[in-house]
Amino acid sequence: MPEDSNTNDNNKRPLEDNNAVDGESDDDIGPMLPPPPGEDAPRKKKRTLAHEKLYLDQLPCADMYEKSYMHRDVLSQVAVTKKDFIITTSVDGHLKFWKKTASGIEFVKHYKSHLSSIVDISISANHELLATISDDTTLKVYDITNFDMINMIKLRYKPKSVCWIHQSGQAQALVAVSEADNSNIHIYDGHADGKPLHTLSKMHSKPVHIIEFNSRFNCVVSVDAIGMIEYWSPEAPFALPDNLDFELKSQTDLYEFRKKKSVPTCLTFSPDGLSFATMSFPDRQVRLFKFLRGKMFREYDESLQAVSEMQQAGTTIHHLDDMEFGRRLAVEKELEKSNQARFVNAVFDNSGNFIIYGSLLGVKIVNIRTNKVVCLLGKSESNRFVNVSLYQGAPKKKAVYTLAMIASENAALKESQELDPTLFCTAFNKNRFYMMTRREPFDDINQKAERDIFNEKPSREEQTVAATQERKQILGTSAIIRTTSGDIHMRLFPDAAPKAVENFTTHAKNGYYDNLIFHRVIKGFMIQTGCPFGDGTGGESIWGDDFEDEFSREFRHDRPYTVSMANAGPNTNGSQFFITVAPTTWLDNKHSVFGRVTAGMDVVHSIESAKVDKTNKPLDDIKIINIDIR
């Protein structure tokens, strides 16, 4: 696992220094002489990346996602093109085109592309063509710039993976499609009638689930179901290209997955084509390879065992409480068993110095030169982010700049050149995709819109959640009880006791509690108020009648400063409430807990210490001035 930039935890040593020049190394071979007396041993020079801050300024950095948009079903993949278009697909066969704008994204077009789940998509090297394949045995080709479907090929088999394998400017738009039930790979002309130009049946022995094209070196890399990796040329006779630095696979580390009995879920090339990254299951390793030599030079351990050990040792980059960590661990195990595991991926940034991928803790940005985690995106979110794609363009940028424009001091021109780095992510079992930017949600105080955009008709479950959230906002989640002895701040629990909270907040807003006294105070036990008669015999709910008890397993009378409803027996709640000053567990399942004091405990104890008469009523009235709901 890569190190946190703020810690000094030891990591697995990288297999090769990516920055080292041939013939140079940080380590000398053989034993070293001890340093002269009085001198410290020479320290190794730390690896650094020149201008790292400049690179980081062009990457997202927010703890939370800024916005999310919907599909009708669970999303499978998201892809970004160089021409500022975003493509999203879902398991119900739907495809959507979006356009990156200065303020976010805009919806462009929606296709019911396939009758079944979209298995894989591929964008051509010139970012002009999109190919999609589905379990409905069809291959569809789209013109990305014009958002049009320009070809449909009916396949005679169930496809597994798809990839454009032609370079920019090439006459034929070649696309490779693998079969799900055998090792065949078929090559088609994406603009033709669908008859295969070639069929490769001996390249692999098992079904191929990953095909990627390195346009710089005109080489295809394919991976099969047992982790075997093959390099081949996209032209007949489809042999090993001549421009590689090896002749035999035994000279490389391409057998690594077969040795470890693990299978990659992705293979992503760096922008310069010199490296590629993989993520794999079940060993959960992130590996980086030199493309020309096929040698592995980085390996990051993201296994559940490693993460659990770091959590227990307190050395994780973001420590979670035990309950949240256990929940995320369960989600990881569920993800590995699901079909969505095949969409787990890693991507490079434009500089090729950083790799970005989802993990249990959030989305990690790792500096592969220094082996440090430089940023953890979405660490405050509960989602498990799966498929990611990075945008690093300037959405306002003009196509052509004149010399006069460049030389001018035009503020609008400078603004048009500003980058808006955005990471687009899908999440496990979610019908939304998420945008991670350099902005936290609602950084703009004038922004009133929700960050979860309902661009599709929500399901019943989502409508219920939205209604609950809206109800919580109306009721309020905190209150300040202003008394003649001082202010008491409290947090409310609308989820656990919705009726009690609604009753309390409505009474408070209507001024019902204003000038009421604390009529019952018992030292070491509690302070009670809310009776309009001041003797504990009165008070009614906002509905006129008593309302039922609301007991919760999560919120009990197990600690002081618990705010609970007073009653005269089961289901007799009115307006009176009390605040405990000690654990009072015998009150559980007898009184409804609806809040806890978060500040002003000294005020509570001040009221508790007041002198009282035989009926436990303070000799000097202590009044509620008003209650502020927030």
UniProtKB/Swiss-Prot annotation:
Residues 1-46 are annotated as: Disordered. Keywords: Isomerase, Repeat, Rotamase, WD repeat. One of its GO terms (molecular function) is peptidyl-prolyl cis-trans isomerase activity. InterPro entries: Cyclophilin-like_dom_sf, Cyclophilin-type_PPIase_CS, Cyclophilin-type_PPIase_dom, Cyclophilin_A-like, WD40/YVTN_repeat-like_dom_sf, WD40_repeat_dom_sf, WD40_rpt. Residues 475-629 form the PPIase cyclophilin-type domain. GO terms for biological process: protein folding. Coiled coil: none annotated. Its EC number is 5.2.1.8. WD repeats lie at residues 70-108, 113-152, 157-198, 203-242, 258-301. Pfam families: Pro_isomerase, WD40. It comes from the Eukaryota. It catalyses: [protein]-peptidylproline (omega=180) = [protein]-peptidylproline (omega=0). PPIases accelerate the folding of proteins. It catalyzes the cis-trans isomerization of proline imidic peptide bonds in oligopeptides. Belongs to the cyclophilin-type PPIase family. This is Peptidyl-prolyl cis-trans isomerase cyp15.
